[in-house]
Amino acid sequence: MTTESTSNKEELSAEQLADDIVQQAEEQVEDQHDHAHEVISAEQEKINELELALATAQSTVADQKDSVIRAKAEVDNIRRRAAQDVEKARKFALEKFAGEMLTSVDNLERALQNIDKEDESNKGVIEGVELTLQGLITSLDKFGVKAVDPQDQPFNPELHQAMSMQEVPGVAPNTVIAVMQKGYELNGRLIRPAMVMVSKAAPTVDATA
Protein backbone atom coordinates (compact mmCIF):
# COMPACT_ATOMS: atom_id res chain seq x y z
CA MET A 1 0.00 0.00 0.00
CA THR A 2 1.37 3.40 -1.01
CA THR A 3 1.69 6.35 1.25
CA GLU A 4 -0.88 8.31 -0.81
CA SER A 5 -3.43 5.55 -0.52
CA THR A 6 -2.98 5.40 3.22
CA SER A 7 -3.35 9.16 3.46
CA ASN A 8 -6.63 9.07 1.51
CA LYS A 9 -8.04 6.43 3.78
CA GLU A 10 -7.13 8.46 6.82
CA GLU A 11 -8.86 11.53 5.35
CA LEU A 12 -11.99 9.50 4.63
CA SER A 13 -11.97 8.08 8.13
CA ALA A 14 -11.60 11.57 9.59
CA GLU A 15 -14.46 12.90 7.45
CA GLN A 16 -16.64 9.94 8.40
CA LEU A 17 -15.84 10.50 12.05
CA ALA A 18 -16.67 14.17 11.72
CA ASP A 19 -19.94 13.35 10.01
CA ASP A 20 -20.77 10.88 12.75
CA ILE A 21 -19.99 13.43 15.42
CA VAL A 22 -22.13 16.07 13.68
CA GLN A 23 -24.98 13.60 13.25
CA GLN A 24 -24.79 12.56 16.89
CA ALA A 25 -24.73 16.20 17.93
CA GLU A 26 -27.74 16.96 15.73
CA GLU A 27 -29.58 13.97 17.18
CA GLN A 28 -28.74 15.09 20.70
CA VAL A 29 -29.94 18.62 19.93
CA GLU A 30 -33.12 17.24 18.40
CA ASP A 31 -33.67 14.96 21.40
CA GLN A 32 -33.07 17.86 23.76
CA HIS A 33 -35.43 20.01 21.69
CA ASP A 34 -38.12 17.33 21.83
CA HIS A 35 -37.58 16.91 25.57
CA ALA A 36 -37.74 20.66 26.09
CA HIS A 37 -40.92 20.80 24.02
CA GLU A 38 -42.43 18.03 26.15
CA VAL A 39 -41.41 19.86 29.34
CA ILE A 40 -42.85 23.13 28.04
CA SER A 41 -46.07 21.38 26.98
CA ALA A 42 -46.38 19.79 30.42
CA GLU A 43 -45.74 23.12 32.12
CA GLN A 44 -48.23 24.85 29.82
CA GLU A 45 -50.79 22.16 30.66
CA LYS A 46 -50.19 22.81 34.35
CA ILE A 47 -50.56 26.55 33.75
CA ASN A 48 -53.82 25.96 31.91
CA GLU A 49 -55.07 23.77 34.75
CA LEU A 50 -54.10 26.41 37.32
CA GLU A 51 -55.80 29.16 35.29
CA LEU A 52 -58.95 27.04 35.04
CA ALA A 53 -58.82 26.33 38.77
CA LEU A 54 -58.34 30.04 39.47
CA ALA A 55 -61.26 30.99 37.22
CA THR A 56 -63.42 28.35 38.91
CA ALA A 57 -62.39 29.60 42.34
CA GLN A 58 -63.12 33.20 41.36
CA SER A 59 -66.52 32.17 40.01
CA THR A 60 -67.22 30.24 43.21
CA VAL A 61 -66.20 33.23 45.32
CA ALA A 62 -68.44 35.50 43.23
CA ASP A 63 -71.35 33.08 43.60
CA GLN A 64 -70.75 32.84 47.33
CA LYS A 65 -70.56 36.62 47.57
CA ASP A 66 -73.87 36.92 45.71
CA SER A 67 -75.36 34.29 48.00
CA VAL A 68 -74.17 36.19 51.06
CA ILE A 69 -75.60 39.44 49.69
CA ARG A 70 -78.94 37.77 48.90
CA ALA A 71 -79.01 36.10 52.31
CA LYS A 72 -78.27 39.40 54.04
CA ALA A 73 -81.01 41.13 52.04
CA GLU A 74 -83.46 38.37 52.97
CA VAL A 75 -82.51 38.67 56.64
CA ASP A 76 -83.01 42.44 56.45
CA ASN A 77 -86.42 41.90 54.84
CA ILE A 78 -87.41 39.40 57.53
CA ARG A 79 -86.31 41.80 60.26
CA ARG A 80 -88.22 44.67 58.63
CA ARG A 81 -91.37 42.56 58.24
CA ALA A 82 -91.05 41.37 61.83
CA ALA A 83 -90.67 44.95 63.04
CA GLN A 84 -93.71 45.98 60.99
CA ASP A 85 -95.73 43.07 62.38
CA VAL A 86 -94.72 43.99 65.91
CA GLU A 87 -95.64 47.63 65.29
CA LYS A 88 -99.01 46.63 63.80
CA ALA A 89 -99.70 44.34 66.75
CA ARG A 90 -98.73 47.11 69.16
CA LYS A 91 -101.00 49.61 67.40
CA PHE A 92 -103.88 47.14 67.33
CA ALA A 93 -103.46 46.38 71.03
CA LEU A 94 -103.18 50.09 71.81
CA GLU A 95 -106.30 50.90 69.77
CA LYS A 96 -108.22 48.17 71.57
CA PHE A 97 -106.99 49.45 74.92
CA ALA A 98 -107.87 53.04 73.97
CA GLY A 99 -111.35 52.00 72.82
CA GLU A 100 -112.07 50.31 76.14
CA MET A 101 -110.72 53.28 78.09
CA LEU A 102 -112.75 55.75 76.02
CA THR A 103 -115.94 53.93 76.93
CA SER A 104 -115.11 54.55 80.59
CA VAL A 105 -114.28 58.20 79.85
CA ASP A 106 -117.63 58.65 78.08
CA ASN A 107 -119.50 57.12 81.01
CA LEU A 108 -117.73 59.33 83.54
CA GLU A 109 -118.33 62.47 81.45
CA ARG A 110 -122.02 61.62 81.12
CA ALA A 111 -122.21 61.01 84.87
CA LEU A 112 -120.78 64.48 85.53
CA GLN A 113 -123.25 66.05 83.07
CA ASN A 114 -126.26 64.35 84.63
CA ILE A 115 -125.40 64.62 88.33
CA ASP A 116 -127.03 67.38 90.35
CA LYS A 117 -124.17 69.71 91.16
CA GLU A 118 -126.37 71.91 93.33
CA ASP A 119 -126.91 69.08 95.78
CA GLU A 120 -124.20 69.31 98.44
CA SER A 121 -124.53 65.61 99.17
CA ASN A 122 -123.18 64.90 95.69
CA LYS A 123 -120.01 66.93 96.24
CA GLY A 124 -117.88 63.95 97.29
CA VAL A 125 -119.19 61.84 94.42
CA ILE A 126 -118.45 64.60 91.94
CA GLU A 127 -114.90 65.01 93.22
CA GLY A 128 -114.30 61.26 93.01
CA VAL A 129 -115.65 61.04 89.47
CA GLU A 130 -113.60 64.06 88.39
CA LEU A 131 -110.40 62.59 89.86
CA THR A 132 -111.05 59.24 88.17
CA LEU A 133 -111.81 60.94 84.86
CA GLN A 134 -108.68 63.06 85.04
CA GLY A 135 -106.59 59.99 85.83
CA LEU A 136 -107.95 58.17 82.77
CA ILE A 137 -107.35 61.18 80.53
CA THR A 138 -103.77 61.50 81.82
CA SER A 139 -103.11 57.81 81.18
CA LEU A 140 -104.53 58.03 77.67
CA ASP A 141 -102.42 61.11 76.95
CA LYS A 142 -99.25 59.18 77.88
CA PHE A 143 -100.10 56.66 75.14
CA GLY A 144 -100.74 59.41 72.57
CA VAL A 145 -104.55 59.39 72.81
CA LYS A 146 -105.94 62.92 72.62
CA ALA A 147 -109.48 64.28 72.44
CA VAL A 148 -110.87 66.01 69.37
CA ASP A 149 -113.28 68.71 70.57
CA PRO A 150 -114.40 70.70 67.53
CA GLN A 151 -116.84 73.04 69.29
CA ASP A 152 -117.40 76.22 67.18
CA GLN A 153 -115.04 74.93 64.48
CA PRO A 154 -115.90 74.39 60.80
CA PHE A 155 -117.37 70.95 60.16
CA ASN A 156 -114.80 68.49 58.75
CA PRO A 157 -116.27 65.21 57.48
CA GLU A 158 -112.85 63.54 57.85
CA LEU A 159 -112.84 64.25 61.60
CA HIS A 160 -116.48 64.75 62.53
CA GLN A 161 -119.70 62.78 62.21
CA ALA A 162 -122.76 65.01 61.77
CA MET A 163 -125.66 63.69 63.82
CA SER A 164 -128.06 66.54 63.04
CA MET A 165 -128.26 70.00 61.49
CA GLN A 166 -129.95 73.09 62.84
CA GLU A 167 -130.46 76.70 61.85
CA VAL A 168 -128.72 79.07 64.27
CA PRO A 169 -129.03 82.83 63.71
CA GLY A 170 -125.68 84.58 63.55
CA VAL A 171 -123.73 81.36 63.05
CA ALA A 172 -122.12 80.53 59.71
CA PRO A 173 -123.40 77.39 58.00
CA ASN A 174 -121.42 74.17 58.52
CA THR A 175 -120.18 75.20 61.95
CA VAL A 176 -120.10 72.72 64.83
CA ILE A 177 -122.62 74.10 67.32
CA ALA A 178 -122.65 71.17 69.74
CA VAL A 179 -120.44 68.17 70.49
CA MET A 180 -122.49 65.16 71.50
CA GLN A 181 -119.46 62.91 71.85
CA LYS A 182 -115.80 63.86 71.62
CA GLY A 183 -113.61 62.33 68.99
CA TYR A 184 -110.15 60.93 69.68
CA GLU A 185 -106.83 60.60 67.90
CA LEU A 186 -104.07 58.07 68.55
CA ASN A 187 -100.64 59.51 67.77
CA GLY A 188 -102.22 61.93 65.31
CA ARG A 189 -104.42 59.31 63.61
CA LEU A 190 -108.19 59.46 64.06
CA ILE A 191 -109.58 56.44 65.91
CA ARG A 192 -113.04 57.87 66.64
CA PRO A 193 -114.79 60.79 64.94
CA ALA A 194 -116.53 63.40 67.05
CA MET A 195 -120.33 63.21 66.96
CA VAL A 196 -121.57 66.74 66.38
CA MET A 197 -124.50 68.98 65.59
CA VAL A 198 -123.89 71.30 62.64
CA SER A 199 -125.43 74.64 61.73
CA LYS A 200 -127.17 75.04 58.42
CA ALA A 201 -128.16 78.01 56.32
CA ALA A 202 -131.64 79.43 56.64
CA PRO A 203 -133.92 78.75 53.68
CA THR A 204 -133.84 81.38 50.96
CA VAL A 205 -136.89 83.64 50.94
CA ASP A 206 -138.26 84.42 47.50
CA ALA A 207 -138.86 88.18 47.56
CA THR A 208 -141.08 88.00 44.48
CA ALA A 209 -143.50 85.58 46.13
Curated annotation (Swiss-Prot):
One of its GO terms (biological process) is protein folding. Keywords: Chaperone, Cytoplasm, Stress response. Its main location: cytoplasm. Disulfide bonds: none annotated. GO terms for molecular function: adenyl-nucleotide exchange factor activity; protein homodimerization activity; protein-folding chaperone binding; unfolded protein binding. PROSITE patterns: GRPE (PS01071). It is found in: Cytoplasm. This is Protein GrpE. The gene is grpE.
